[in-house]
């Protein structure tokens, strides 16, 4: 169960402070949304480019290898596994291959002159260069559609998970809250409780490590008791894990109650009366450079990344 601690899901890396840490959280949030939204209606080349950009950002930022190596390795392994499974799976299309006779009836009645013969020869050569089935050996068959679906699924898994984790890794929960609250300021005109939403977001981000720690401790306690799972059988094993899940829920509710008590002791009554001083958000030169890069990013996406 050391996997929970070795994979820093939703955890903030305090040291070392990289250039990604120093960017404005609002700029990083817009970059994150760009990664998640530019994927839609994009071609496969753009989807692969997003994966390459995420890996490149991680390497350029000089994030310690111990932080990202195992998680990126697991995600890449999962993505390649999904790619392989989806590529050899049926594509769901009952494709009719090229018919023996031309579909246009006029071709049968045309006179066989030299120009028509040359045109037909060129069309025949071009049609032979295209193959719908890319690989077929025994029960394994890879088609163009199955490969396209495999690339879509595998890249979106890596992009969604790793881009979100990279954002949480380089942005403190308080910075995320301040950035989201700043971006949501126009919603106050519609009487939307922006402060309550951002406070809930902060507490949720702070609660993620506690959940991982509780799961880690409970599973370790079960493993150290040397339970004979074969004697218990399926019904007994399910009963044990139901007890563990019940205990986990009790511990999480206890942690939440302790957090609420700590806020009450500190005089917290409501978000509007107890203002928490978040970070002073000001755009600097590096933030404007990131915004300019974002403009170039979307320009390339619109010109070259559209799905054909």
Swiss-Prot record:
Q: What is its main location?
A: membrane
Give compartment(s): Membrane
**Top-rank taxon, per record:** Bacteria
Per UniProt, the keywords (alphabetical) are: Membrane, Transmembrane, Transmembrane helix
Question: What's its membrane topology?
Answer: Multi-pass membrane protein
Q: Does the keyword Ribosomal protein apply?
A: no
Coiled coil regions, renumbered to chain: none
Q: Which InterPro entries match?
A: ABC/ECF_trnsptr_transmembrane
Gene Ontology CC annotations of this record = plasma membrane
Output the CDD domains linked to this UniProt entry.
Answer: EcfT (cd16914)
- Membrane-spanning ranges: 41-61, 75-95, 153-173, 192-212, 288-308
Q: Which family does it belong to?
A: Belongs to the ycf92 family.
Tell me what this protein is called: Ycf92-like protein
The source organism is: Nostoc sp. (strain PCC 7120 / SAG 25.82 / UTEX 2576)
């Amino acid at each position: 169960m050391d996997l929970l601690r070795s994979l820093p899901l939703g955890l903030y890396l305090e040291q070392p402070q990289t250039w990604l840490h120093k960017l404005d959280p609002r700029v990083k949030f817009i970059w994150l949304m760009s990664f998640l939204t530019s994927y839609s209606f994009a071609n496969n080349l753009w989807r692969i480019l997003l994966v390459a950009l995420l890996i490149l950002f991680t390497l350029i930022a000089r994030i310690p290898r111990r932080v990202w190596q195992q998680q990126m390795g697991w995600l890449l392994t999962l993505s390649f596994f999904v790619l392989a499974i989806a590529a050899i799976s049926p594509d769901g299309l009952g494709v009719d291959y090229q018919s023996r006779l031309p579909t246009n009836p006029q071709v049968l009645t045309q006179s066989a002159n030299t120009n028509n013969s040359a045109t037909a020869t060129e069309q025949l050569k071009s049609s032979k260069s295209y193959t719908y089935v890319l690989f077929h050996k025994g029960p394994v068959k890879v088609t163009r559609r199955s490969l396209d679906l495999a690339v879509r699924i595998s890249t979106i898994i890596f992009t969604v998970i790793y881009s979100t984790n990279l954002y949480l890794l380089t942005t403190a929960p308080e910075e995320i809250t301040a950035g989201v609250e700043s971006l949501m300021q126009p919603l106050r005109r519609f009487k939307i409780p922006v402060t309550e939403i951002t406070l809930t977001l902060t507490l949720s981000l702070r609660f993620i490590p506690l959940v991982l720690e509780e799961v880690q401790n409970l599973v370790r306690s079960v493993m150290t008791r040397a339970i004979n799972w074969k004697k218990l059988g399926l019904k007994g094993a399910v009963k044990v894990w139901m007890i563990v899940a019940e205990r986990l829920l009790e511990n999480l509710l206890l942690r939440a109650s302790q957090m609420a008590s700590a806020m009450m002791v500190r005089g917290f009554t409501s978000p509007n009366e107890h203002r928490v001083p978040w970070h002073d958000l000001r755009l600097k030169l590096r933030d404007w450079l990131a915004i300019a890069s974002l403009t170039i990013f979307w320009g390339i996406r619109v010109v070259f990344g559209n799905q054909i």
